[in-house]
Design a protein with these regions (language model features):
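ADP-ribose/adenylate-binding Rossmann-like module
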Residues: 69-87
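N-terminal Rossmann-like NAD(P) cofactor-binding module of classical short-chain dehydrogenase/reductase
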Residues: 52-57, 78
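C-terminal catalytic/substrate-binding lobe primarily of soluble NAD(P)-dependent oxidoreductases
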Residues: 120-335
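Rossmann-fold NAD(P)-binding glycine/threonine-rich loop
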Residues: 81-101
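Conserved Rossmann-fold cofactor-binding substructure of NAD(P)-dependent oxidoreductases
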Residues: 39-50
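Hydrophobic/small residue at the entry helix of a nucleotide-binding pocket
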Residues: 13
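NAD(P)-binding Rossmann-fold cofactor-contacting core
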Residues: 24-37
Length: 335
């Protein structure tokens, strides 16, 4: 008998998750466009009463209700959120089953990969996680088209980010910390955005010297965002900014994911570096952001049903083995 999985959210990522899982699991999917409102906790209780696990693929604001009910019903819980406050709430829920937020691309797969690379070192001087969800071709001044949740994008650009500096956890400002990158001969820029470190800063505080996550974009994007968010103070009017982006910034499925981890440290007394780089493209079925994000949470779900992750309580991304994550039919997209 197939395990029954509920997917809440039927947008681009929710659809992709269902497409990946439908041959292996019995799927039950709900969305506000079909009358299911996850903001109503009683509707959530009714929807989840007969499933083995739930994936939240909707806006992060609904995750608190879903996580609360998942714990009540003793079912596995997974989400994709980059929102730190929501993750802290999920962490505080007492459950006899797995509670695993942040199971997408970044946070998610990037943290699992970085933790795996760091294990090779006797001492880590610096761990750098860099991810970009980029259009393959752009002609606008932003050098950017939308390929995923506008709400999630704005949230990442507005909130403080976590990092480790000289062994201690710190907060850094979004849209700051700009750096130039050259990857396989092509120029990019990277800067601070929130959520990408997940829980790694608390895990590695006093264990590594420096650790950071930044978002990759084409050169010039950051200056335009600082003008909108800071100079025009639109970070205080997120609803206005979201409507503006959705109306005026084109959406694309012709995208590429740049997945980059670099770790510098000592191995047997010698300073060394190791890098993991993948460029992941879309195909006729999925865009690149759909493939990577949906595959991340689907791989975690598969590991859950194979008893490869703990079955009780809050589970950190960095506690997952990269070898297990990439060995199943979903996680192999990152190889």
């Amino acid at each position: 008998m197939k395990n029954k999985v509920a997917i809440i959210g039927k947008g681009n990522i929710g659809w992709a998750i269902k497409e990946l899982l439908k041959d292996t699991y019995e799927i039950k999917q709900g969305d506000i466009t079909e009358g299911f409102d996850a903001r109503d906790i009683n509707q959530v209780r009714e929807f989840l009463k007969d499933v083995d696990a739930v994936i939240s693929a909707g806006p992060f604001a609904i995750n608190k209700n879903i996580g609360t009910v998942a714990a009540e019903l003793n079912i596995g819980y997974f989400d994709l959120t980059e929102d730190v406050e929501t993750t802290d709430f999920i962490r505080g829920i007492k459950s006899e089953n797995v509670m695993m937020p942040q199971c997408g691309l970044a946070p998610g797969a990037i943290n699992i990969c970085a933790a795996s690379l760091m294990k090779d070192f006797d001492h880590v001087s610096e761990a750098m996680m860099r991810v970009g969800a980029l259009p393959r071709f752009t002609t606008n001044e932003m050098s950017y088209y939308l390929s995923w949740s506008t709400n999630g994008l704005i949230n990442e650009y507005c909130n403080e980010a976590d990092a480790i500096y000289e062994g201690k956890c710190i907060k850094v400002m979004p849209l700051e910390g700009a750096e130039k990158m050259i990857i396989e001969g092509e120029s990019y820029e990277a800067f601070n955005t929130s959520g990408g470190c997940a829980t790694m800063c608390e895990t590695y505080e006093n264990k590594v010297d420096n650790l950071s996550y930044k978002t990759i974009r084409y050169p010039g994007h950051l200056n335009h965002m600082k003008f909108l968010f800071n100079d025009l103070h639109l970070k205080k009017n997120k609803d206005v900014l979201e409507k503006l982006f959705d109306k005026e910034v084109p959406r694309t499925t012709n995208d590429v994911i740049i997945f980059f981890v670099k770790v510098i440290g000592e191995i047997d007394g010698i300073l060394q570096e190791k890098t993991y780089l993948r460029k992941i493209y879309g195909d006729d079925r999925f865009s690149a952001i759909q493939r990577t994000t949906a595959s991340g949470v689907c791989s975690c779900l598969e590991m859950y049903f194979k008893d490869q992750i703990p079955k009780k309580g809050f589970t950190k991304q960095e506690s997952i083995l990269w070898e297990d994550f990439t060995s199943n039919q979903f996680g192999k997209v990152y190889l």
